[in-house]
From Swiss-Prot:
Subunit composition and interactions: Part of the 30S ribosomal subunit.
Biological processes, Gene Ontology terms: translation
Keyword Acetylation: no
Protein name, per record: Small ribosomal subunit protein bS18c
Amino acid sequence: MDKSKRLFLKSKRSFRRRLPPIQSGDRIDYRNMSLISRFISEQGKILSRRVNRLTLKQQRLITIAIKQARILSSLPFLNNEKQFERSESTTRTTALRTRNK
């Protein structure tokens, strides 16, 4: 094969298929907190289907389970710990400023 045709051939590298995040035996339920907590961000938001790598049906069931857990106060609606940490560390220094005339 000459060099010009060789450039377009791709090497057939094997890739390892990722395991699905929800196994067939896992029950998607609002009481299954270990499963639900995997699909929530650190801020308490529901992660998107693309990030979770779920099917449409699984994502719908996860979303419903998370919302039920929030209503029954098993999960917080928001996790605002980062906001409090940020507000404590910032200090205002208005007294040190001098006005230029």
